[in-house]
Structures are given as structure tokens and as C-alpha cells.
Amino acid sequence: MTLSFKPEDKLILALDGMSGAEVFMLIEKLPNLIWVKVGLELFTLLGPQIINQLRDRGKKVFLDLKFHDIPTTMGRACYQAAKTGAELITVHACAGKKGIEEANKSAVKGAKEVGLPPPSLLAVTVLTSWGSKDFVQELGIQQSLDQRVSLLANLASSAGIQGCICSPLEVMKLRKDFPEPFQLITPGIRSCGENINDQNRIMTPLEAIDAGSSKLVIGREVTSSENPSDAFNRICSQLI
């Protein structure tokens, strides 16, 4: 069977819970790794230079800072974020259509000023740590979790951005409404038998790809492994 995609290009490794030295040691052990995710923890620890350092090592960067503020602030933040060269940048869909539009317009401007292609902006719908019961009880939102995800994905699409972040459990329905090239990127990925940690809405890698995920965010299954290369290659093999 000939694959229509490269398995390694479907996986984004979350670089959480590590120092800069540990990040670079891990990267050296993963020659087939293409995508890395820089989240709030690593960005706060090391600043924007970590993105340049990862790109210098040939990695594509998913900058997952989940910007959520008034439109002007979101625009200014995404303008600066785009100048780092990150290929993917997240905003919260709950920031609203105006905020997302301003973020997208400013990101395009920032990238252009430094001679880079514009990043893809992705809207976070509902965090995968939320379960349906907690979602209603704690936030008081009288919508089902699925309904809320659909509403926010539609908002993101109407704002003109390139995709959204959702759990793998919502992907199949969203993919029917939003065909490629709209990106559906999914955390909450665990191979069979792996600890689910703080995720609630999960699937295996192959299940998520079959459901319509564009890319999968993986983390502790690789970063906590005694042999990260074997763990990464094992996940890749599950997609073949």
C-alpha cells in the first residue's frame, strides 16, 4: 500500500516539562522528528529564541500560546509571534471573530515584514482536559460539549483562519463540515495501554487519523520513554 502522507509529518511532539538542554538532547535522539510544539511553559522559560534554535535544527514549530485577549492585543501578539518563524500559532476561539481576524491579519503582516511565509492560525475550541460533566457544572454553559466545539469551529472558519484544535472525538463530525485543507489538529492522543494522564477525550493515533485529524499532538509517550526514538518510531508505525 502506498501512503498518501508521511507518518512523521502527522506527529507534533510537545516539548513540555523540560529544560533547554533536555530539549536539545531529546531532539538529537529523534532524527525523523519534523514538528515540535512550544507551549506556555517552555516559551516562558526560554523566550522566543527557543523557536529560532529549534528551526536552526531543522524543526517546524507549532507555537501553542493560545492567545486570548482583546482584538488589539491579540493582533500585536500574533504580529510578533509570526516574526519568529513559527509555522502554526494558536488563539482561543472564545476570543471572538474580531479578535481572530485581527490576529490573522497581523500575523500575515509580521511574517511578510521579515520575509517569511505567513503562519497558519489555529483556533482552540474546547481543551481536551474538559469532560462533558465538568464542562456544564463548572462553566455553566448550557450546551453539550460537542455543540460548543462545533460552534467555535464555525466561528474560526468564518474568521478566515486555517484550522482549529479539538479532541479526536470531535474530528469526524467536524471533518464533514470542514474538508481539507482546513486543519484539524488533535491532542489527546494515546497508544493502547498508555496512561491518559490529564486528558479526558482521547483516541489512538490511527483512530484519530482515520477520523480526519490533520496532525496529532503527542508528548509524554515519547518524552518520558527510556528510548524516545523507539517510542516515536512505534507511533509512526501505527499510522502505516
From Swiss-Prot:
It catalyses: orotidine 5'-phosphate + H(+) = UMP + CO2. It is an enzyme of class 4 (lyase). Pathway: Pyrimidine metabolism; UMP biosynthesis via de novo pathway; UMP from orotate: step 2/2. The keyword Lyase applies. It comes from the Bacteria. Coiled coil: none annotated. HAMAP family: OMPdecase_type1_B (MF_01200_B). Belongs to the OMP decarboxylase family. Type 1 subfamily. This is Orotidine 5'-phosphate decarboxylase. It comes from Prochlorococcus marinus (strain SARG / CCMP1375 / SS120). The lineage of its organism: Bacteria, Bacillati, Cyanobacteriota, Cyanophyceae, Synechococcales.
